[in-house]
């Protein structure tokens, strides 16, 4: 009985630690993808390519929202807001403003990997 209880506790603790690792790596992977696509959005925005800026900003937003659901912090939330603003302004043809918002999103998303508030 005592051995069985110890095995159950050990298995539970192991499962807890493994799930925490998956949780953390899922958040990080989505933030990394969000940053990658936001960087592409900025690069295209600087070239005046509105359609490509929008494509990458939308993909970045998808990953930023997934990162938020996986335990993102306030920086992820700010990044999401800037991506939404980038998309809004891009759709209105304001490529310069959209590019600035995409750049702000990158800064917040990168900061989210270093701080937990």
Swiss-Prot record:
It is found in: Periplasm. Sequence repeats lie at residues 27-33, 34-40, 41-47, 53-59, 60-66, 72-78, 79-85, 86-92, 98-104, 105-111. Induction: By copper. InterPro entries: SmbP. Keywords: Copper, Metal-binding, Periplasm, Repeat, Signal. Residues 1-24 form the signal peptide. It holds the Pfam family SMBP. GO terms for molecular function: metal ion binding. Residues 27-111 are annotated as: 10 X 7 AA approximate repeats. It comes from the Bacteria. GO terms for cellular component: periplasmic space. Monomer. There are two separate and distinct copper binding sites, a high-affinity site and a lower affinity site, which display negative cooperativity. Is capable of binding multiple equivalents of a variety of divalent and trivalent metals, including Cu(2+) and Fe(3+) but also Mn(2+), Ni(2+), Mg(2+) and Zn(2+). Is able to bind up to six Cu(2+) atoms. It is proposed to be a metal scavenging protein that has a role in cellular copper management in N.europaea. This is Metal-binding protein SmbP. It comes from Nitrosomonas europaea (strain ATCC 19718 / CIP 103999 / KCTC 2705 / NBRC 14298). The lineage of its organism: Bacteria, Pseudomonadati, Pseudomonadota, Betaproteobacteria, Nitrosomonadales. The gene is smbP.
